[in-house]
């Protein structure tokens, strides 16, 4: 077993692709790279990729689930102790974003790319991109995802962002309203 050092952003991106508890980094990378044991290593002269931008064609764990299952998962989040223990709106906001991403990565990616302010970008694949649209944006990494989001917006804007994402992901508007009311 060899050890390599990766930056925090890359580590989080790899970790966001964990499919089950206890899965090793090697297993995750093998799956992501479609590399099997015993396969000869191909050496390519490739340019480094700047940011792990989420792809619209990325397979989505939520695509196979029925819409009722997605709705139930969001309702269960709203009733969970973990959600109830969140004292700050920003923490509830981040928990909701993580859950929506986990339910349907492709739909989440599509929804976030269409979500921008007049002068700001709200979501990006790295902190630097968000800081370029404003130095006081307070970017935070959305746990379990390759995304960063600005967090120095008021609660109303956070609600608006969640509502846009949920409606873009085809959640019932009543559920989106209910979720936004808890932020």
UniProtKB/Swiss-Prot annotation:
SUPFAM superfamilies in UniProt: Replication modulator SeqA, C-terminal DNA-binding domain, Ribbon-helix-helix
Pfam families registered for this protein in UniProt: SeqA (PF03925), SeqA_N (PF17206)
Residues covered by region (Interaction with DNA): 89-90, 118-122, 152-158
Signal peptide extent: none
Location of region: Disordered: 43-70
Keywords: Cytoplasm, DNA replication inhibitor, DNA-binding
One of the record's GO molecular function terms: sequence-specific DNA binding
Compartments (UniProt record): Cytoplasm
Subunit record text: Homodimer. Polymerizes to form helical filaments.
Record HAMAP family: SeqA
Record family assignment: Belongs to the SeqA family.
Protein name: Negative modulator of initiation of replication
Source organism of the structure: Pantoea ananatis (strain AJ13355)
């Amino acid at each position: 077993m060899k050890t390599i050092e990766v930056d925090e952003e890359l580590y989080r991106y790899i970790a966001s692709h964990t499919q089950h508890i206890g899965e090793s980094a090697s297993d995750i990378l093998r799956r992501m790279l479609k590399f099997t044991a015993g396969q000869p290593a191909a050496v390519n002269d490739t340019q480094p990729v700047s940011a792990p931008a989420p792809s619209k064609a990325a397979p989505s764990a939520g695509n196979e689930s029925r819409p009722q299952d997605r709705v139930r998962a969001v309702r269960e989040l709203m009733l969970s102790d973990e959600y109830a223990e969140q004292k700050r709106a920003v923490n509830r906001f981040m928990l909701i974003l993580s859950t929506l991403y986990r339910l349907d990565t492709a739909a989440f990616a599509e929804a976030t790319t269409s979500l921008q302010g007049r002068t700001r970008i709200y979501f990006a694949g790295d902190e630097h991109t968000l800081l370029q649209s404003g130095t006081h944006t307070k970017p935070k990494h959305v746990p379990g995802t390759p995304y960063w989001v600005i967090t120095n917006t008021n609660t109303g804007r956070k609600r608006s962002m969640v509502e846009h994402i949920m409606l873009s992901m085809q959640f019932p508007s009543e559920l989106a309203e209910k979720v936004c009311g808890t932020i």
